[in-house]
Amino acid sequence: NMVQFKSMVQCTSTRPWLDYVDYGCNCDIGGTGTPLDELDRCCQTHANCYTEARKFPECAPYYKTYSYTCSGGTITCNADNDECAASVCNCDRTAALCFAGAPYNQNNFDVDLETRCQ
């Protein structure tokens, strides 16, 4: 779920969570358009991963709770998660690690979606 995703991002990155919420074209719920950079591409991939997770019965990625641990920037999704939870956890894990490895461009924060996101 989104609270757990926030915690994962905070575990892997030194940036405040809110720096990612309105970044680029794809880092907000319902984001769309060609990614502006690597970090925005992380968000697009995360959104696409959630779309795949929704294929499991009654799987709602934004709300699904899962079990995981995070220590020293290493995230482990627990093996006892059901299919939906495992899928969502892996989506969030992959995105959090992607965020941590991608450069942050302040010019891509709070962009004008109509002019910059086609």
UniProtKB/Swiss-Prot annotation:
It comes from the Eukaryota. Keywords: Disulfide bond, Secreted. Disulfide bonds join 11-70, 25-117, 27-43, 42-98, 49-91, 59-84, 77-89. InterPro entries: PLipase_A2, PLipase_A2_Asp_AS, PLipase_A2_dom, PLipase_A2_dom_sf, PLipase_A2_His_AS. The keyword Transferase does not apply. It is found in: Secreted. Its main location: secreted. Pfam families: Phospholip_A2_1. SMART domains: PA2c (SM00085). One of its GO terms (molecular function) is calcium ion binding. Expressed by the venom gland. GO terms for biological process: arachidonate secretion; fatty acid biosynthetic process; lipid catabolic process; phospholipid metabolic process; positive regulation of fibroblast proliferation. One of its GO terms (cellular component) is extracellular region. CDD domains: PLA2c (cd00125). Belongs to the phospholipase A2 family. Group I subfamily. A49 sub-subfamily. Snake venom phospholipase A2 (PLA2) homolog that lacks both catalytic and neurotoxicity activities. This is Acidic phospholipase A2 homolog. The lineage of its organism: Eukaryota, Metazoa, Chordata, Craniata, Vertebrata.
